[in-house]
Amino acid sequence: MEIIKRNGNVEQYDKKKIAVAIQKSFASVGTEIKVVLIDEMVGAVEQFIEAHSDMRNVESIQDQVEKTLMQNGFYDEAKSYILFRFQRTERRNAINSIVADAEDEDLKPILKKISSDYTSVEYSLLLLSDKFKSFCKDDMKQADKLSALVKAAVEMTTQEAPNWEFIAARLLSYKLNRSIAAFEESVSVHSFYDKLRYLTDERLYGEYILASYSPEEIAQAATFIKEERNDLLNYSGLDLLMKRYLIRTYSNKPIESIQEMYLGIALHLAINEKEDRMLWVQKFYDILSKLEVTMATPTLSNARKPFHQLSSCFIDTVPDSLEGIYRSLDNFAQVSKFGGGMGMYFGKVRAAGGKIRGFKGAAGGVIRWMKLVNDTAVAVDQLGMRQGAVAVYLDVWHKDLPEFLQLRTNNGDDRMKAHDIFPAVCYPDLFWKMAQEDINQPWHLFCPNEILSIKGYCLEDYYGEEWEKRYIDCVNDARLTRRTLSVKDIVRLVLRSAVETGTPFTFNRDHVNKANPNGHKGMIYCSNLCTEIAQNMSEIESVSTEVKTDDGDTVVVRASKPGDFVVCNLASLSLGHLPLENESELTDVVRTVVRALDNVIDINFYPLPYAKITNQRYRSLGLGVSGYHHALAVRGIKWESQEHLDFVDKVFETINRAAVEASSDIAKQKGSYKYFEGSDWQTGEYFTKRGYTSPEWTALAAKVKEQGMRNAYLLAIAPTSSTSIIAGTTAGTDPVMQRFFLEEKKGAMLPRVAPELSDRTFWVYKSAYHIEQQWTVRAAGVRQRHIDQAQSQNLYITNDFSMRQLLELYLLAWRSGVKTIYYVRSKSLEVEECESCAS
């Protein structure tokens, strides 16, 4: 028997559909029904159909189901069924109206899926249809009508109906894929291999992909694509991917789909795998496309492309010489050119009034060099997208500190300002001890070059008790000139700048160096632009300059020792999207991303040879997290609670253990990093310093000692300001600033909604500015035990915060073992995030 559908098509009669409809009508009112009774009513409907051949259409059959329910006395169920039919009719009418207004029949299945997935009344397509009509004009082109439809969905996103941002993303995804399909048709691209061949020929894709993978492997990789994972993206995330990360034509049209982007990145990350390469391609693709992991902005943007600079963070130790300073400026320019962020340690540079070649008072000090750093940041923009970004670090005992702390403030001599750099201060434990015990004690500022010339050592080359001993030695040496202020004066300058500008960043040098697993090979003087990296550093040293003849030409050859020019590759676990209670699954994701990050080291394009040398010596990683507040909220865990601290203690210990074991297992297969012997990893000190004494940790320590470690450094929590938007989660370890707000960008209002905002999570998402900051600092201290590097840890203060309250937060952070503090975010202050570290 054949049944006529509403669109005129014919399909075979299926009595299961009638049975399901009857069953749903009972379920909707909470009553049970026996299967025998359902069969009886289905039989009655079938008798009617067989007796009336002219009534064999969907509407007539549904009318008969209503009558059968009422004839059997099921009035509530019949009422529910009638309401269901009415809603389905409304839905069909809304879909047909949108399709007609958009002049696009292919929209119908997309709208049907949306209607099926979002059944609540606040997501009715009738509402979308009405909104769309207000935007849609008859003279619009079809593409503009699709844009208007997307805009309509975006503007319907509210605190009460947050999922419209996912509906808007589906419509935008359809528009994108429609545009890409038309482009592919125009250039005769019919497969993923064809696509890669075209992109390679256009020099939009790196030749190395097709040179390394066979056509059969590319075809196999294409089968990994799961287009339905586009539905995981919200509008803000998809919009950001389209604008910044997808490959575009030279006329600026996106020609790469979202899933093709993730697969292309996976192909690049797995390119050097010797065994099970396609398995690793699939595993890398899965963690990225499921939004379980986000790679840092440079990796996400540049992997698979001809110029594949994949690293986020670079740190240079600036020498105290004209040649060295200008080389560091050039290093910054080269890093910035390829989209990296920079940290620069100026603690070795002589202070203002210091000697130059014996002439007293000749040195201009670090502030003059700050102006050049500032101008370099402005002049050399990141891939033409935005100006360079650099944090400049100075020790709290440096003679130029008072002027340094006023670089970004609005008062004072503008010739002494550098508004486009981010100042940061390195503190020893002694400073915080004195601030805690008696803030009125004197604090002495010295010139590092003068200490070296008179005392024969560099004070900055020591930490802990040895530093304190030498600092007191300097204080007691009358030959050393100094500036003496009280600790209170220094603190006042720091806090005033922090409240006004958000900076200086904080680097607790003794905490960092005492926990350094590679202290046998160097010293950590400072951190990077976003304060999460802490690795061995040393300056580049000039060796010689020779004039030679090469093929009849005279050439000048400059030789230098590379030092430790820090570079780090970042990725983040999206905690809000991961099964954190399932240790096995979480461990598998961590192991996968550690392998991906280790591969980045070998496939990376380095803007400087010094960076390549250091990266291959240490093979350092920076695995962090995003979605921290998201993960707490969906579990109903309040930020200001012991439950929060206990939960993250367990989660971060699991992540750390998985990362250490993954690195050790890779070392067994591929070899350890160069300086493993003598490291805290090898001696076991890494584990004892952190109190890792359980049987699991003891066994892992023995395993590491036997197998080695592939990577010198593993964990670092970056801010993830951009990539957390892509993943539709909260940034880094920060709490949300607002549950819902509208952000104006290029004339459009974009909704920003806390992830999975609902009646259940609403009150758990407490604003960062309303959270007691002591809980934030305590949580950072709990996490720090499990993080071998550092964290981009922000503090959030309101306008009624006193200087004493802010100082207490700094002291609590120091007492809690927190290594670094990033911005102090005042409610009246807006600060600009670093894109490079936005992993």
Task: Report residues per predicted region.
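Polar, glycine-rich mid-to-C-terminal structural blocks
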Residues: 406, 419-494, 498-501
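Catalytic alpha/beta core of large soluble enzyme barrels
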Residues: 217-220, 226, 230-241, 531-535, ...
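Alpha-helix capping and helix-loop boundary segments enriched in small/acidic/polar residues
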Residues: 9-13, 33-36, 102, 253-256, ...
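Core alpha/beta catalytic barrel or barrel-like domain that forms the active/cofactor pocket
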Residues: 85, 92-95, 125, 164-170, ...
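Internal maturation/activation junctions in enzymes
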Residues: 287, 329, 589-612, 638-720, ...
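Core nucleic-acid recognition elements
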Residues: 9, 32, 36-263, 267, ...
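Function-dense linear segments that define catalytic or interfacial modules
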Residues: 247, 253, 260-261, 265-277, ...
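Terminal amphipathic helices with adjacent charged low-complexity linkers/tails
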Residues: 74, 80-88, 164-196, 427, ...
